């Protein structure tokens, strides 16, 4: 595959990579529910079922990313330069972004206090599950597809194309509103920029984990309303105008999230452009 023209390889990566992910997300959950969930027994907790789904689906995504990297000559698992430092920066960006989005929701008057809570061990287990989920997504999109496309068409095109694919595939996960899709594209651009700038996946994984993990396990904003199977430190619900997060999609479909992403992303794009070479095996 490495001897093929880079443009052909890039196009094939987008088509085959998108198709494989769509097929997995389309049929995988049903297969897990029919064949694996019964193995847990009738009394299995929601947290156990959620863990099984994430391990089965996102473990497969991670394996596909690593296999694809081996076939294409891309170091999918490359952490990038100064991984601890870049992970810290990524985590701070993720926490800052979600904080801005929540602030806009609070200003709009849609934030409500719920009644959920979570035990420490459950929250730690939930953190590991969220980490696996976001790490698998970053391995696939920013660790594999983005570098392959960047070889042919450069970092800018790669970040944009992979971000659009990232957003479209989330349609299979329930992201239905136009605002939600725009936010997913912007989030993909943010994670893609971090990957390209740092030369690896440590920074985007940390940013993605900080954003999703705090939204679910610290603030209890996903799902909305209520809390997930692992509980949350706080339980904030969003009720009111959908444009500020008052829908079932919560912050992900809010204008506040869009503003937060732009506040974080625009200065980064203005400050510097991604420069490192694509990592090769």
Where would I find each of the regions flagged by the language model?
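N-terminal, membrane-interfacial amphipathic/helix-forming hydrophobic leader that caps
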Residues: 1-75, 216-281
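N-terminal export and membrane-targeting signals
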Residues: 2-17, 81-89, 120, 153-157, ...
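Alpha-helical transmembrane segments of multi-pass integral membrane proteins
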Residues: 17-25, 49-57, 89-93, 129, ...
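Juxtamembrane helix-loop-helix connectors linking adjacent transmembrane helices
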Residues: 28-50, 70-139, 146-151
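Hydrophobic alpha-helical transmembrane segments of multipass membrane transporters and ion channels
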Residues: 60, 92-100, 161, 260
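Transmembrane helix-loop-helix hairpins at the membrane interface
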Residues: 120-280
């Amino acid at each position: 595959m490495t001897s093929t023209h880079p443009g052909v390889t890039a196009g094939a990566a987008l088509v085959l990579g998108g198709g494989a992910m769509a097929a997995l997300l389309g049929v995988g959950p049903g297969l897990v529910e029919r064949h694996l969930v019964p193995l847990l027994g009738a009394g299995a907790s929601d947290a156990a079922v959620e863990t099984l789904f994430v391990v089965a689906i996102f473990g497969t995504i991670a394996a596909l990313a690593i296999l694809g990297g081996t076939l294409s000559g891309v170091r999918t698992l490359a952490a990038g330069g100064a991984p601890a430092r870049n992970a810290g920066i990524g985590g701070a960006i993720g926490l800052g972004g979600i904080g801005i989005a929540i602030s806009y929701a609070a200003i709009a008057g849609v934030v409500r206090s719920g009644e959920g809570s979570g035990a420490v061990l459950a929250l730690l287990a939930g953190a590991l599950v969220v980490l696996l989920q976001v790490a698998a997504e970053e391995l696939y999109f920013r660790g594999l597809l983005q570098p392959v496309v960047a070889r042919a068409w450069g970092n800018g095109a790669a970040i944009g194309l992979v971000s659009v694919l990232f957003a479209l595939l989330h349609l299979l996960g329930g992201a239905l509103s136009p605002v939600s899709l725009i936010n997913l594209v912007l989030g993909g651009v943010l994670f893609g920029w971090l990957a390209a700038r740092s030369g690896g996946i440590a920074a985007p994984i940390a940013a993605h984990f900080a954003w999703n993990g705090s939204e679910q396990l610290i603030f209890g904003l996903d799902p909305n309303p209520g809390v997930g199977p692992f509980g949350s430190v706080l339980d904030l619900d969003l009720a009111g105008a959908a444009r500020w997060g008052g829908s079932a999609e919560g912050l992900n479909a809010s204008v506040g999230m869009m503003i937060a992403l732009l506040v974080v992303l625009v200065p980064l794009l203005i400050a510097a452009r991604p420069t490192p070479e694509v990592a090769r095996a």
